[in-house]
């Protein structure tokens, strides 16, 4: 099945301004300022709720796989920072296929159009109409503009026939599930059996169905609790999505009253062989440090290895560890403002190696630019392939008195002591996705299982923060750009000086953001995310202490992180808690962040159990108040870790008598619905509910 460019016409639009008619997006003319569609200025004000859109009608029904946006030949503030794309067979029935934003540059950008409607895997759907809804330009006071749109996909009869068949099967299955769920809710299990036999489906005697039968139909709460403990718990653990498991819990280890002072721009790595953390350099706002510290985790003790020796003062450098060879590699330095009229005489990139066993620093190069490596750089990316003995360096700002200049991608062979600059090409299908390795303040992580480099985030030439990500297949030097999923709220904001950790065992990257760009503003706002390599999705995680209002790390950037992934611990130290260049707020706090991979399951099981016991408590309140209080004290308080306020509120509620007149059957069903909402069910789960009635009411 051949993918090709799909022809279309302009079907309708919300508005347009002056000569900027929607028909202009049919022609790619990046050097013509008028060759674009712009919505009417008076209509597209932020406080106006009227939706702006343009609808494209394809010449033929087709599986639309992706959409390409052309741009003006220079960055333009009218480019779309946020937009949604819908698609479908009919104008009145279209589904969201993409939510994304364009980078404010001159490069074309291509995005996949897909939907998770017919199965768990994202697929393209057959469309006759495509609707583009602009939401925001790169500047609020400017019109929202689209310069050019190209659609690509497959319109062969065989492909459409196969898609239609899958669509019909999926809709039929959903219809059956709705019927089964409704009749189970009404207690008509004989009708459920007839439907299942007619379609040759197995009868769903799942723990959830048995629990519903015991709880809602028979009213046996004690039996329901036993069913939950003996059967449903195991099913929850098996079905729970891995990406919904993880939380962090922070613990402050120490504040440095002596020794290590406040700083940012320092580097920190963890060595599993000796269970120690190695920290080098940094800046306190006035002084640049050359101190080298070792933290012994077992002894909870910091030891200064050297204070004024080699490799010397530095900040915004990078340091990585090769645990197999027990070597540290250190590169880069920030010498002052990149706008100085002259390059400082010591602005060279010296490259150092530290032998952990011998505790000796060795200079591998006094000027890497003369040895085939990068020029004097800072805020670059650095990672190591321990198996092959290669250190990779990407981006970073070079010293230039006139403009920001960024480096490319380099590899250093630690065995042969040789630098090599790597040329990267892009996959044919992504030839218009020109990911720029040349950036600063970004992250780069090496993924050993697939011999790939992941590069994301940082700052571009125009000093805008970026989030785009690509991975580089090192065997072929081929780059593939990762495209954010349909909802931009499901990915981090563009950021600078974020910190990342590769967890290769679990195929994920932990990233700690702090200095983010929200719309046109750059703000300090903490956020923790995991990028799952297998599913190519970002998932936001949280610090439990922050959720509970307890002590936790504040917003920061330029901090240092290191991870002991064998014990599921991330260490965090220092950073800058202010974005004001003249009023920096350097930090000296030291934190341990425990990675709780099973927190989601435990939280779910605890909440389900609590709901059942609360229902039993309210049943006893209606029958015998003394027994209810005894049940709370002996069966609930020892099992659930709740505050005195929680238990006091239950007692007061019991004595108020508000539950005595409530219909017991209705209360059981409400409790079951609360439990159902907590469970990791999917669209194939048959669970008793009355959603069928709601659907009929909605469509009639």
From Swiss-Prot:
Name the record gives this protein: Mei4-dependent protein 6
Pfam families per record: Kelch_KLHDC2_KLHL20_DRC7, Muskelin_N
Organism whose genome encodes this protein: Schizosaccharomyces pombe (strain 972 / ATCC 24843)
Disulfide bridges in this chain: none
Kelch repeat residue numbers: 276-322, 327-381, 390-439, 452-499, 508-558, 569-619
Note: Transcription is induced by mei4 transcription factor.
InterPro entries to which the protein is assigned, alphabetical: CTLH_complex_component, Galactose-bd-like_sf, Kelch-typ_b-propeller, Muskelin_N
Keyword Nucleotide-binding attached: no
Keyword entries, A-Z: Kelch repeat, Repeat
One cellular-component annotation, GO: cytoplasm
